[in-house]
A protein has these predicted regions:
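Cys/His-rich finger/ribbon microdomains and the adjacent scaffold used
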Residues: 1-7, 36-39, 52
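N-terminal pre-triad scaffold of radical SAM enzymes
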Residues: 2-24, 108
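Short, glycine/acidic-rich beta->alpha junctions
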Residues: 7, 11, 35, 42, ...
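Glycine-centered small-residue hotspots that permit tight backbone geometry or close packing
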Residues: 18, 22, 29-30, 113, ...
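Conserved, mostly hydrophobic/aromatic
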Residues: 19, 23, 43, 86
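Short helix/loop capping segments that flank catalytic or ligand/cofactor-binding pockets
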Residues: 22-25, 35, 68, 120-121
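Iron-sulfur (Fe-S) cluster-binding segments and ferredoxin-like electron-carrier domains
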Residues: 25-42
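Conserved SAM/AdoMet-binding glycine-rich loop
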Residues: 44-181
């Protein structure tokens, strides 16, 4: 535990190593194959230990929404008065149950990673998310009480056009409208 570090207020728990999605820009999905998820029981035990030291359990992995039992883990942490804070979530894998668990866990912000402003460019980089899937995840998270959504985008991708960059602004605006309701 290092209180001076960037995540010093969290007890960090590695929930998975590697990634199953194979996004073309990400090394984790290629370097750390096959993906390995820690069991729910192992994660719960780590959370119990972590809650003895910190009130926030930081869940670490390349993509947390696909970790088996992650919603149950967030509920488990919330039931014990803690907050589960996952790293980035893939919007099309977020379930309503996970969104509610994150809201119950007093998360003020959650990060999703559309990466590109258009479905065309997301397909190019193998980040196969549709805008309706991204907006549905935003609706569920905001509806569950999450007050802020952080979005990860990249600019300068191969085949990117001006319209793709403009799409970042448009998608961000649509998500922002949901957050401000």
């Amino acid at each position: 535990l290092t209180p001076e570090a960037v995540f010093g207020d969290m007890y960090l728990v590695e929930a998975s190593r590697g990634c199953e999605w194979g996004c073309r820009f990400c090394a984790a999905g290629y370097m750390y194959r096959p993906i390995r998820h820690r069991s729910l029981e192992t994660l719960q035990a780590a959370a119990v230990e972590g809650l003895e030291h910190r009130s926030t359990i930081g869940l670490v992995g390349a993509e947390m929404a696909s970790v088996p039992g992650v919603a149950e883990l967030c509920e488990f942490v919330a039931d014990r008065g803690g907050r589960a804070s996952p790293s980035s979530l893939k919007a099309d894998v977020i379930t309503n149950r996970l969104a509610r668990a994150l809201g119950r866990s007093a998360n003020q912000s959650v990060t999703i990673a559309p990466e590109a402003g258009s479905e065309r460019l997301r397909r190019v980089i193998n980040k196969n998310l549709t805008e309706p899937e991204i907006l549905r995840a935003a609706d569920w998270l905001v509806g569950a009480g999450v007050r802020a959504l952080k979005l990860y985008f990249m600019i300068g991708l191969p085949t990117e056009t001006h319209e793709d960059v403009e799409g970042i602004l448009e998608l961000t605006r649509r998500i922002g409208e949901r957050v401000q309701r």
